[in-house]
UniProtKB/Swiss-Prot annotation:
PROSITE patterns: GST_CTER, GST_NTER. It comes from Onchocerca volvulus. This is Glutathione S-transferase 2. Residues 80-200 form the GST C-terminal domain. Residues 1-78 form the GST N-terminal domain.
């Protein structure tokens, strides 16, 4: 099966998908386009949106739908209904945090960055710290010893927030250890080192 993932030349909404594909050693074409070129091809995509995954000749958009599609195909979606629901819940929480993050990044970076770091982020991270502790005492992955698509979403969210504030995880030992555990996975380590050396932007406006 051939895959092509089309997105802008940033991390953004596509990065958890890239991490999934890289870590699972799934071959794909990483199609990165310039923002200025998007208007001329926008009509080609469902909802006029990116990222877009081509699974053979099928086009899939919406980043969460893409992740769950891949998770079902490669058995990273939990082993039963409750596990699937649990990681869905986790990912929805990650999405909620990301909405708050992107609102600050794109709409009020200069005035809201410090209040976001000091007043909003700690409470949000505390929720994930508590939830992570419910499986295996938080000493491994979200589902314990089994990786799922939610691990890639959480890892990326923690990573971009550490760029925003390098000390944001200092009071959350389970999240900090989880982040390092994911970062040390061999394929992710190699990918992230190359990405970071290339200084790939996190967001489309250059702010991070």
């Amino acid at each position: 099966m051939s895959y092509k993932l089309t997105y802008f030349s940033i991390r953004g909404l596509a990065e958890p998908i890239r991490l999934f594909l890289v870590d699972q050693d799934i071959k794909f074409i990483d199609d990165r386009i310039a923002k200025d070129d998007f208007s001329s091809i926008k009509s080609q995509f469902q909802f006029g949106q990116l990222p877009c995954l081509y699974d053979g000749d099928q086009q899939i958009v919406q980043s969460g739908a893409i992740l769950r599609h891949l998770a079902r195909k490669y058995n990273l979606n939990g082993e039963n209904e409750m596990e699937t629901t649990y990681i869905d819940m986790f990912c929805e929480g990650v999405r909620d945090l990301h909405v708050k993050y992107t609102r600050m990044i794109y709409m009020a970076y200069e005035t809201e960055k410090d209040p976001y770091i000091k007043s909003i982020l700690p409470g949000e991270l505390a929720k994930f710290e508590k939830l992570l502790a419910t499986r295996g005492n938080g000493r491994n992955l979200i589902l314990g010893d089994k990786i799922s698509y939610a691990d890639y979403a959480l890892f990326e969210e923690l990573d971009v927030h550490q760029i925003l504030d390098p000390h944001c995880l200092d009071k959350f030992p389970l999240l900090k250890a989880f982040h390092q555990r994911m970062k040390d996975r061999p394929k992710l380590k190699e990918y992230c080192e190359k990405r970071d050396a290339a200084k790939v932007p996190v967001n489309g406006n250059g702010k991070q």
